[in-house]
C-alpha cells in the first residue's frame, strides 16, 4: 500500500484561501455588530480576498517552516503581522490602480493611504497566532490517500514506538 501523500501546494493554497475568506466575512460581521449594533451580522468581502489570503498564508507557511526552530512564537507572529501589513498594502495599491480595492481605511485615525491601519495591529497579530497554530500546522499534517474509499474506515497505522494508532 502506498503511503499517503501530503497535500499539494495548490491544495493548501485552496484551503488557506477559503479560511481567509471565511474569517474576513466573520470579522466584518462582528465589526458591524460592535460598531453599529447590527443584529443582522452582515459580513462582506470581495472575491479578491481568495487570492489575497490564499497566497499570503501560503507564504506565511514557508516562513513558519523556516522560522519555527529559530525564534519564539511571539517573534514569528510579529514577523507575520509585518508581512500582513506589507501584503495588504501591496495588494491594495495594485487593486486601487484598477479601481478594484475592496477596503478603505481612510476613516481610521492611524491609516496609511487608506490601505492599511495600525488599529488592526492587535487583531492581525492574534490572527497570525491562530493561523500558525491551528491552520498551517494542521493543514501540513493533512494527507491525501488516493487508494482510500470514500467513507471507508481508516486503516490503523503502526507508530514508530510500536503502538498502533486507531481513531
Swiss-Prot record:
Subcellular compartments: Membrane
Cytoplasmic compartment segments: 1-14, 62-72, 131-167
GO cellular component: membrane
Entry keyword Transmembrane: yes
Membrane topology (Extracellular): 36-40, 94-109
Membrane topology of this protein: Multi-pass membrane protein
Keywords: Membrane, Transmembrane, Transmembrane helix
PANTHER family, sorted: TRANSMEMBRANE PROTEIN 229 FAMILY MEMBER (PTHR31746), TRANSMEMBRANE PROTEIN 229B (PTHR31746:SF3)
Name of this chain's protein: Transmembrane protein 229B
Phylogenetic placement of the source organism: Eukaryota, Metazoa, Chordata, Craniata, Vertebrata
